[in-house]
Amino acid sequence: MRLIPPINQLKQWILAWQLRGQQQLARWGIREQTLLIGLSFIVGLVAGGATWLFEQTVKLIENYYYLPLANSTHATTRWPCYVFLPLIPAGGGLALVLWRRLWGRQKSELHGLAGLLHSLSRESGKLKASLGIETLVASSLTIGSGGSAGPEAPIAVIGASIGALCGNTLGFSRRNMPILLGCGAAAGISAVFGAPIAGVLFAMEVLLRDFSVRTLTPIVISSVMASTMYVGLSGGGAARGIFQMPTNGPALAFTFGQVPYYLLLGAVCGLLAVGFTRFYLLVENYSQKHRSRIPYFLHPAIGAALSGVCGVAMLIIFRDDPFLHTRFAQGYIPIFSDGYPTILRMIDPRWYSGVHTIAGHTINLTLEFLVVICVLKILATSFTLAPGGSGGVFAPALFIGAAGGGAVGLVLAHYGLVSDPATYALVGMGAVLAAAIQAPLTAIILLFELTQNYAIMVPIMLAAVTATVIQQLLVGESLYTLPLKKLGVKLGAAVGISALQRIGVDQLVLLKAQVARPDDSLSSILARSHLDGEEDFVVMDKTGNYLGLLTIDDLKTVLLEPEAAPLLLVGEVMRADVPPIKFHDTLDAALTMFGRFDISRLAVLDDVNPADKTPALLGFLTRSELMKRYQQELAGDLTV
């Protein structure tokens, strides 16, 4: 008797447990949709706890690695010692590489939220639960060592992996797995900002692109639970997150005469988002292009070192500023890490009015300071993340928007057109975010929840929509979808596309496929087609490797010249350009292939065989079967 390997035996036990559990729930009359509601509470609570753990891990690395090294080497206080500053984030980059190698995972072409979007759009939410642990440590190393990145995207990925773990454990169907991932992602964003509604909209507008009631309910529950859990663990009072608004926020008052100014602000923020996106893409393309010349595992460290050079530039430019000199002595560089403390100063009116003084010097945020940190933040973030660092662009986008908006506010205030530049910094913060991630609704509601003031709505709506349109016209994609576009993956919107993304080929009825060999004559294929009524054939070699398709259109062409059929071989006329579809691919991927190659059938291959075996041919997927299943799913969504 052959012994079953322990790992396979464990998988069999888990599968058997799932099947027994599903059967028992069915006996009790508990549907998976009902179970999803209950599970959303658990996902939200665990994601809220994971957010707190992530925050503490970042602080731990910052307090026991970055600050001791910065202070002991005088890297932020003395000119000759500035050269040591880039080495500190570079060390974090090397630690990141070692962690990934230890974990057995290398940076793929799609990571972070781009990887999560790909999983949702092409794999029905298929996500490894271990990705959460890998992301927690990797992003903590990047941000805690001074890398310019935000915690929001990592926390969203961690939350999604928690949802994936729960769904996989209970054997959830592909229909509901994306919703669980959305629950986790919404929970993470909610906990970061203490903004449950923004978390819900982020998951539905950016990730799922699905606003159906069936999707909304569990995501709302997870978002609220995560915010509640984080507040409980952090000891906060009201619903506050990692990012907390200043107690003296800008005086929000809107008049019709300010419309042109906010449209101008939106245009500036849109151009900033375009510049940020294009430079990020430039660095990423350069890194990928030079993989062979520079060992790829060194790229995160080199990028982190370059972000450190940006910090050195800031030290040199502002070393005579009394306030910044004090902050530099504490090891703080405004463009490093998430930049939250600097964002809070930029949206606080007191930092524009000369209320603060240090050693007899009045402290004001100047136009020079805002412009410089805006440019340096774009550079530092691109150098940190594009070569392989782990983190998000959410916080950098807020930082860039606050700096750009504050600069616009100062210029307008100089000419007596406005009285409070901090308001423009606040609105600019949301406008750049809306443009960079192409999610204006999320940005609008996020600012409303942060300020808890309805007066912000019209200004941010004007600026966010203007900025988003400019980004759409000049770039056409967000920072999250650009990597997908490079791989030929297009994301749709609304319920229809969502339905295609959550249904797998494995849920459809396949037709039996007839196999032809490349050395078969076309006359023999025509005879088989006439005898059996077959229209399409899968062309495979003798070892079972897929080579292409022979379609009815190819046969019709031969029928016009039947005397040539005995002289032609299948391999000479087959469609070698048509790839097969995998058994666990989504209908979205299948529909894309149907449209791209203009065919009515696709060969379906098994994708669960060991790597050393040839994938088995399972049958044909027809376009008509796909559309029939799609209409059924769409009708179900609209009636929920």
For each predicted feature, which ranges?
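Alpha-helical transmembrane segments and immediately membrane-proximal extracytoplasmic
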Residues: 1-502, 506-507, 511-512, 516-528, ...
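Tandem CBS (Bateman) regulatory domains
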Residues: 480-514, 526-530, 546-602, 607-640
